[in-house]
Amino acid sequence: MWRPMRLCHFHSTLLQSRQKPWPCPAIFFRRNFKSPPARTSRARLLWRRALSATVVGTPFLLGAYYFMAEASERRKLRLAVDGIGRFGRSVKIGLFISTDYWWCTNVVLRGVEENSPKYVEIMSACHQRAADALVAGAIRNGGLYVKLGQGLCSFNHLLPTEYIQTLRVLEDKALTRGFREVDELFLEDFQALPNELFQEFDYEPMAAASLAQVHRAKLHDGTDVAVKVQYIDLRDRFDGDVQTLELLLRLVELMHPSFGFSWVLQDLKGTLVQELDFENEGRNAERCAQELKHFHYVVIPRVHWDRSSKRVLTADFCNGCKVNDMEGIKSQGLAVQDVAKKLIQTFAEQIFHTGFIHSDPHPGNVLVRKGPDGKAELVLLDHGLYQFLDEKDRSSLCQLWRAIILRDNAAMKKHAAALGVQDYMLFSEVLMQRPVRLGQLWGSHLISREEAAYMQDMAREHFDGIMEVLKALPRPMLLVLRNINTVRAINSNLGTPVDRYFLMAKSAVWGWSRLVGAAYQGIYGSSLLRHIKVLWEALKFEMALRLEILAMRLTALMLRVLVRLGFAPKAEAEEVYQYLEM
């Protein structure tokens, strides 16, 4: 029988004493994790105690500082913490929207025709998701975010329908603040509480906007007033919110180079600073009232300066319904057509005559009430954002409008260039919000699908060009365009009861006539010759305008006849007809 060979005692001991390359777990842990020397153990213990003291002591010290600090310092600490949350939410929303659009356009819709039902359905769902995310984020963050969302509502000719319908929620949506915050602000600005400054003060806000909320109150002499109280933290968080939005817009531009809106935010910085100064708003209101005093149907609430500051504005209380509330207008026994006409004439007067232009005339800032004569009065609110258009730019704008109506392409190009724009035809269509090349609609045959699609999708197809046009404009003209487009949107919401194009052009006629009259004063010695020259130019302009309106109406009538006879697709012809009526 075979037996295994055994080593002698000497060699066996030598083999066992040799270190193994892979020791058993017990030996490994005993060898590597045995108790450290006393000096190392003492240092590690000190580090642990210091770390524990930092973790426990820092919150305690911050809490003690918070409770010992003044109210304004405590507010800044809260803002710092809340700012982290707003930043995180904003980045999350920006990444979600950018990624969603990238995935839909580059993966889901790769190879799909743009006008196919599948493409339209998927992009519509993508637009809706993005709009929902924007609204939810704006409401949650409040302040500046809501303000920018409201501004987007007026771009209903440029943004998809899903955005416009969803963003309208922000026109009346804002976070209200409690009475303690109102008291704190009054103590900081007036060293008195509201019930000391007013005979009555309702802490429940009657309206809330993106920058402030409005309270109803009564002065000691019995005058009913509206007190606009700015949210106390807006000035402190302004810089941080603007920087966050700049970062988001740059992030979106990296993924979508054609989406170049970061320059808009740069321009809005200065205007938002104006809106945060309620003393400036009061001065704007008084100037507006003075310049529009010949329009007896325009009402500007009187400012009470002894109860106003940079963050509080007290003015006469004026009741009324929103200018786009058709039912509210009719319930007062007023004519919608009269309201729309007065609205357009009021802001056309500012654009073409005074040059001092209300830049935020959204429906919440224009109320309608019945006047002493039984007809509509317009109450203009929120005068925080105004833009002054100097005589040079106003002259170029009037002459451009005149050239468009006279179909003078050379003059259109010249006056658009004076405003800094090279693509004069695209700018003219953006300015007029309707087709300038009306001749393209005429022909002995039916309107083609391509022409109808151009009318419907001009903004979408020329998005890059529109961005270049807007960037090239003088900055005052941006807010003028905002005014024009907001008024157009209100007129459209009222069912287009009046011809905005005709009223605006007619105002441009007289604005240009005044400028020409001033220019001819130094050329013609006789005032009679000067007036004859001005009247002749105005008459030519008036005739061209009426011929233009007639051509528009004949075009619309022809389209309807063709539809009735079955020679034109009803849906496409109706879209063009509606566009002509805008």
From Swiss-Prot:
Record localization: Membrane
Domain Protein kinase: 179-419
Transmembrane segments: 50-69
InterPro entries to which the protein is assigned, alphabetical: ABC1_dom, ADCK1_dom, Kinase-like_dom_sf, Mito_struct-func_regulator
GO cellular component, one term: mitochondrion
Function, as annotated: The function of this protein is not yet clear. It is not known if it has protein kinase activity and what type of substrate it would phosphorylate (Ser, Thr or Tyr).
Gene giving rise to this polypeptide: Adck5
Membrane topology: Single-pass membrane protein
Record family assignment: Belongs to the protein kinase superfamily. ADCK protein kinase family.
Matching SUPFAM superfamilies: Protein kinase-like (PK-like)
Name of this protein: Uncharacterized aarF domain-containing protein kinase 5
GO molecular function: protein serine/threonine kinase activity
Documented EC number(s): 2.7.11.-
